[in-house]
C-alpha cells in the first residue's frame, strides 16, 4: 500500500520506552515533543520517589494464577514505585501462572490485579476468590490497577507507578 511502517520494540523497561518515544517522535518530525513527553514522564516518576531500603513485598495476580515476574512492565512499575516483586524474587520470568500454594507460601504484603473486563464468573476468575486467598487477603489488600496501563508500554507507565505509590502509602502507615 506504500505506507511507511515503523515497528516499536514494545519493551518492558523505562529506558526502552524512552527509546521508542524518541524513535517515533523523530519519524514524525516531532523530536521536541518527544523529549518533552519524556521529561514530563521522568518528572512524574521522580515525584514521590521512595528511598526505603526495605521495600515491602508485592505481587501481581491475574485470573488463572498468572503473575508478572522479571522482564514485565509490572515488574518495572513495582520497582519504580518502591515495591519488591516477590514473583521476580522467586525466579518467575515474564507472565507465568503460579500455583496458588506458592502464592500463599510467599505471603505477599499486597496483591495487585488488573481486570481485562467486567468481573465474571469464569473458572480463571474464581481463583482470585479462592477461600485460601480470601484468608490471606483478610489482612492484606488486593489493589486494582486498571489494565489500560499495561496494554502496551508508553507514557502511561508513569500513571501506573503513581497508583502503585498511592497503594504503598496505605501500607507504610
Which residues are covered by each model-predicted region?
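Short, well-ordered secondary-structure micro-motifs
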Residues: 69-72, 123-125
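Ligand-binding "clamshell"
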Residues: 1-6, 122-140
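Extracytoplasmic substrate-binding proteins
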Residues: 1-66, 87-89, 94, 106, ...
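Hydrophobic residues within well-ordered alpha-helices
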Residues: 78, 103-104
Amino acid at each position: 500500500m506504500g505506507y511507511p511502517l515503523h515497528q516499536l520494540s514494545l519493551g518492558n523497561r523505562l529506558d526502552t520506552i524512552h527509546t521508542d518515544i524518541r524513535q517515533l517522535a523523530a519519524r514524525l518530525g516531532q523530536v521536541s515533543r518527544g523529549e518533552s513527553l519524556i521529561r514530563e514522564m521522568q518528572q512524574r516518576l521522580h515525584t514521590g520517589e521512595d528511598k526505603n531500603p526495605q521495600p515491602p513485598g508485592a505481587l501481581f495476580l491475574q485470573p488463572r494464577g498468572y503473575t508478572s515476574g522479571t522482564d514485565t512492565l509490572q515488574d518495572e512499575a513495582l520497582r519504580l514505585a518502591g515495591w519488591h516483586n516477590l514473583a521476580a524474587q522467586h525466579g518467575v520470568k515474564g507472565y507465568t501462572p503460579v500455583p496458588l500454594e506458592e502464592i500463599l507460601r510467599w505471603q505477599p504484603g499486597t496483591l495487585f490485579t488488573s481486570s481485562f473486563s467486567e468481573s465474571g464468573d469464569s473458572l480463571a476468575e474464581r481463583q482470585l476468590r479462592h477461600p485460601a486467598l480470601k484468608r490471606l487477603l483478610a489482612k492484606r489488600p488486593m489493589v486494582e490497577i486498571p489494565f489500560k496501563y499495561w496494554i502496551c508500554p508508553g507514557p502511561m507507565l508513569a500513571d501506573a507507578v503513581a497508583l502503585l505509590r498511592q497503594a504503598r502509602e496505605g501500607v507504610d502507615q
